[in-house]
Amino acid sequence: MVPLAYYGQHFVPLDYFYQLSSANTLTHQHTGEKLNQFNNQPMAKVQSHSNHFAVPPLGSNKKVQRCSVLPSPKSQDKISQSFCDRFLNSPLFHAKHQNTPSIGLHWRSSLWPAQRALNSHLLHSKAQTTSSSDLNMTSSLELNQAALSLQLPFCKPQTTSSSLDVCWRSLSLKSHQRVSSSSLFRLQNQEIPSINIIWTSSSLGPKRKALSSTLLQSKPQKTSSLDYLWTSSLQRNQRSLSSPSLNTKLQTSDLFWTSPSFKPNQIALTSPLLDSRLQKTPILNSNPTIGGLPVSHSKARQSASSYFVHPSENLPLFQLNSQSMFMLDCNFQTTNSPVCHSKFQNTTSPNGKHRVTHLPSPHPKTNISGQLLSSSKHCTRNTAASTLGFRLQSKSSFQFSPKTESNKEIPWTLKYSQPCIVKGGTVPDDVVNKIVNSISNTRIQRDLCRQILFRRMRGRPNPHPGPRLSSNYVVCLACASCLKSPCNHLRGKKNPHCATLSVIPTPEANSEGKIEVKLVLILSLPETFSSCLPFPMKENQPNEVPEDNLEGVEKIQQFFPTSERDIQGLNMKQIWWAVAPENKVIGQQPQAIDWLFYVKKNNSQPQSLLPSTSSSTSSSSTTSSSSSVASASSDSSSSSSSSSSFSISSSSSPSKEFMTLTLSRPVFRKVLSYHRLPAGVSWLEFIYSKDYQLHPRKPNRSQSSSLKTKPVRNNNTVKWRKGANTLFKFFRTK
């Protein structure tokens, strides 16, 4: 009879899978000389409350070790055909998804080519709660004496305890040939049935290759009959299938389980029986020396001391409703492996072929479906500790870097190089000292450092203190202190009590590391030149000079200072008085000439500046100035004859006429243009020459030039005035 396997939705003969798996496995020949050693080399013993059989599937891409699972010849005749029928109809295993073309859970044994072995195959069922015959198990028994020597017998049931220990003894073969270790099928997106299983693999010596086998354990009640043993196990299997199946989440990383280096007659893997009321808490006890779990995606390589077994993504230790405690007691160096994979195992690097990661044995937890999952508290604690340490390290490095940068800078202090300089007036020394002491050095240094910082932020090349750096402070002279809050003395922008203290540091520090600071106190209202104004001359001025001339001089005084340097640059400021574009030629110099006459008059006789001088000196100065003014005005008045002009010498026109005539723009131009310097005469020569007489030829040239250009301008101005008058009359009538 050809055994069948459930593949997809069809039943496929198992010979097809034999051919697939045999292509990926190595055929091994074992000498018959070592067959008699299996009684002296017990490998493992497992006891459990569960009565279910489960074998992890073998990987299709790995080396498959075929092993035979056969009952002993003593108990073989006791298995009835009815038991086989009941066992075939019992749904034991369940798988939801099967992506690989390999069969689910089956064992294969590699025998000699001349011998045939018993093949028992456990198949998956598609549905979990179905009661149909989902398991097809066929066994072809050919009793051969050589084959029976390789079969693993059952142990006798133990009547002293409440369970039957089924011991499977594996062979330990001494061979220098390469024997493939037992590997497991990889479960891809499958649900493992609720079974208690421990898959152990062992290797013997550095030159010994051992065959690993699965260890199954069933625990029925006390009985001497194997038939009743099998029937009770089938009933418990049906009850266990009614409970929800356990889910095994496959992880993305491959885990190689290192099998312990067993020596014959030294190790027994025991699991004592406990009360059913105990919790399901698997405890893994081992020596402090714990072997590592190398993580890699490559194939398991055979080492001198141990085998790397590549199981499915995890080797679960499942539990059913029956409560038990598994304890692995090891008296030697063993590998401490967790029961199930945690979710954090997918973070292991796939390139760590020779890398060893030490994984502790956490206390597993049971989820809702009853599956045992390893606790990931230790992993999360390690991850949290590593992240916390990294954050603390980065924070400390971040806090340390500004300190190192600040230490590179040379600490500097302030030092007043000289007494405070007062500009714009005179202030008592006591007030200046109080003002300087009211501002602390730390405040000045902080403000200068801020400016240095702003320069660095803008990317400027010179962050050091220099002449461009300065800090200004508002100072009240009445309070004699710096203003930190509003002061009652300061009202308005122009206040005589307000002053500004400027602190200007030197570019570099001296040898002592101190930066000298220059203090400058600038008054808001500097000393005005009110004494130079010609207001006292108003009373002593003759009638030939009109009052409107003085008003024009006052207006010019507001725009032009008294220094000679500013007088030289008056040509650049002549556009201020050019009212219309056609009047630029005429209005370039008159506004400055009025001021020059005034300066010349003051420089010729400085006694006229004082109002308390004698009347004779003032009258002589006024007569001399009036004569020069009259001579210049006669020339200019003769040259400027138009409808809009008026005679300066006429004293009958009071200031009322000036107010009415200044409303029109050309009239204002004529007020300022009655003084003219001849061509070729500089202003400085005119000012410093006391008895300067105008040459008759030079005014003629200017007169001829002015006569050529005047008619056009006069026509334009008359037309403009007429047009303005007509528009004014038009709007007035309406």
UniProtKB/Swiss-Prot annotation:
Cited InterPro entries: CSNKA2IP
Main location: nucleus
Entry annotated with the keyword Ligase: no
Subcellular location: Nucleus
UniProt KW keywords: Nucleus, Phosphoprotein
Keyword field contains NAD: no
Record field: compositional bias (Low complexity): 612-654
A cellular-component GO term for this protein: nucleus
Segments of this protein annotated with the region Disordered: 608-654
Record's comment on post-translational modification: Phosphorylated by CK2 (casein kinase II), specifically by complexes containing catalytic subunit CSNK2A2.
Role played: May play a role in chromatin regulation of male germ cells.
Quaternary structure note: Interacts (via C-terminus) with CSNK2A2.
Protein name from the UniProt record: Casein kinase II subunit alpha'-interacting protein
Protein species of origin: Homo sapiens
